[in-house]
Amino acid sequence: MKSYLDLLTDVLENGSVKGDRTGTGTISVFGRQYRHDLSKGFPLLTTKKLHFKSIVNELIWFLSGDTNIKWLNENGVKIWNEWATEEGDLGPVYGKQWTAWPTKDGGTINQIDYVVNALKTNPNSRRILFHGWNVEYLPDEKVSPQENAENGKMALPPCHLLYQFYVVDNKLSAHLFIRSSDSFLGLPYNTASLACLTHMLAQQCDMGVGEIVISLSDVHIYSNHMEQVKTQISREPRKLPELKLLRKPESIYDYKFEDFELVGYDPHPHIAAPVSI
């Protein structure tokens, strides 16, 4: 994906040095966008190997509404461990807001149900979206993620926070807004996850897939990722893999990792980098 490598180059060449919540330090640019036509392959990076199983299982976990890392750990996903309490709780993060947004009368709203129904019944609507930015549950930046979760707040606020969908010629496209993008570690996962979700929704609604568009606000590279980024930029992108969904589950909530087949993934080796907490 040359567009992703171009984005990394943009940050390296034009980024401003900034401090950040983690204390690591970054170089950052503000306001960028890139897109990918899903008919040209599945957007899983080939310039470094990514763990596809973690991407799919995290998305399945989000859609389940779960906010405890126990299921993730049991399914080989460790990417949330640093922020969870000893009991594995993360507070009302992504899945809670997606599937059970609290209402003032004590009920909940399932935004994913709304999206699926709207795609099936009113695909020309400009209101087909969901988001996770529930101000009432945003964390207190003065305390740790674990303390926030223990206090009923999110351990971390959503980075990938608003998803909107668009249908033309019976093909589904998706637009994601990311407020804060760790461009080396986080963005490749977000891109592939968005593509998976688009394929899943399209299948559930008997549509084809169009393109994904990602709008990024604060796009940064952490100071301890600079050499890794330069290594990645030096690599030549290879042909993208294809994604096949092997069955059509009864609902968007019933997918399993075994339903996803990645064909022709031939990436360069993995590039390790530390996570800033």
UniProtKB/Swiss-Prot annotation:
**GO BP terms, alphabetized:** dTMP biosynthetic process; dTTP biosynthetic process; methylation
Q: Which domain of life is it from?
A: Bacteria
What does the record give as the active site? Answer: C159 (nucleophile)
Q: Which cysteines are joined by disulfide bonds?
A: none
Q: Where in the cell is it found?
A: Cytoplasm
Q: Which Gene3D superfamilies match?
A: Thymidylate synthase/dCMP hydroxymethylase domain (3.30.572.10)
Q: Which reaction does it catalyse?
A: dUMP + (6R)-5,10-methylene-5,6,7,8-tetrahydrofolate = 7,8-dihydrofolate + dTMP
Q: Which GO terms describe its cellular component?
A: cytosol
Please give the InterPro entries that the UniProt record associates with this protein: Thymidate_synth/dCMP_Mease, Thymidate_synth/dCMP_Mease_dom, Thymidate_synth/dCMP_Mease_sf, Thymidylate_synthase
UniProt enzyme class: transferase
As for what it does, the entry says: Catalyzes the reductive methylation of 2'-deoxyuridine-5'-monophosphate (dUMP) to 2'-deoxythymidine-5'-monophosphate (dTMP) while utilizing 5,10-methylenetetrahydrofolate (mTHF) as the methyl donor and reductant in the reaction, yielding dihydrofolate (DHF) as a by-product. This enzymatic reaction provides an intracellular de novo source of dTMP, an essential precursor for DNA biosynthesis.
Check the record and name the PANTHER family matching this protein. THYMIDYLATE SYNTHASE (PTHR11548:SF9), THYMIDYLATE SYNTHASE 1 (PTHR11548)
The name on file for this protein is: Thymidylate synthase
* Source organism (scientific name): Pseudomonas putida (strain ATCC 700007 / DSM 6899 / JCM 31910 / BCRC 17059 / LMG 24140 / F1)
